[in-house]
């Protein structure tokens, strides 16, 4: 197993368990303790993890942690899958027949797209994945916002996408995020963040679609404030403290 594969596996184990010992990682990957220690030291130097006695813990488990690693589209599909399903089911209940809806990028929004009611809708999206899910739906009028293609998230971004969005009227926007902290909503990429910011500014109703693992985290680019949103759609069993943190700024829908 090459170093990049080992370190990806280490990130995955820490994401799932929070804290992992050197022996646990060594056994899981079938490599020596010394190799794992070198990997952990390198990841710690990048700020992705924290070294603890005998192992490591995820840096993202600290309160107010800065996200250091942007997960790929395929990696995100496997994380918090049940929560994403619950959020998507609740979010589609907010959609009204005949409305123009913006669906952003992200795996939770894709779950929404797969559950859309079978009535007439106009869907605007910069997500190739959302477009592919809906292109056979005859009851959905589709507008794919083109531009520069960002493969990591299957998203179209850049000036062309922004110019297209500026010309459109949107009834409701449903957008995901990587971090929610102190009322700020953030994502990992500035170009994607500008699209999300613009889509919210054009929408009459603005909904953030995010599971509670995003709360207390921040990422590189802040694209909106919770105070400017109509609601955050979360999973039903959100922690009381997390709910209270959001409700200081806007409504929580579960």
Please give the residue ranges for each predicted region.
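Catalytic nucleophile loop
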Residues: 107, 124-128
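Short glycine/serine/threonine-rich phosphate/pyrophosphate-binding segments
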Residues: 108-112, 215-218
């Amino acid at each position: 197993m090459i170093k990049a594969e080992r370190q990806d596996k280490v990130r995955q184990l820490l994401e799932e368990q929070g804290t992992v010992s050197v022996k646990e990682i060594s056994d899981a990957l079938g490599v020596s303790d010394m190799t794992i220690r070198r990997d952990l030291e390198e990841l710690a130097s990048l700020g992705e993890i924290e070294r603890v006695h005998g192992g490591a813990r995820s840096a993202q488990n600290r309160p107010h942690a800065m996200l250091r690693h942007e997960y790929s589209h395929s990696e995100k599909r496997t994380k918090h899958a049940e929560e994403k399903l619950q959020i998507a089911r609740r979010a589609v209940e907010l959609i009204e027949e005949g409305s123009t809806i913006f669906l952003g990028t992200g795996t939770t929004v894709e779950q929404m797209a797969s559950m859309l009611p079978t009535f007439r809708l106009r869907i605007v999206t910069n997500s190739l994945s959302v477009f592919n899910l809906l292109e056979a739906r005859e009851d959905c009028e589709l507008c794919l916002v083109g531009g520069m293609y960002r493969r990591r998230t299957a998203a179209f971004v850049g000036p062309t996408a922004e110019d297209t969005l500026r010309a459109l009227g949107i009834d409701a926007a449903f957008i995901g995020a990587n971090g929610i902290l102190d009322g700020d909503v953030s994502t990992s990429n500035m170009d994607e963040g500008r699209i999300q910011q613009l889509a919210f500014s054009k929408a009459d109703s603005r909904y953030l679609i995010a599971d509670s693992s995003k709360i207390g985290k921040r990422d590189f680019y802040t694209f909106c404030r919770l105070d400017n949103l109509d609601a955050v759609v979360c999973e039903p069993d959100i922690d009381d403290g997390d709910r209270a943190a959001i409700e200081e700024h806007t409504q929580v829908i579960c």
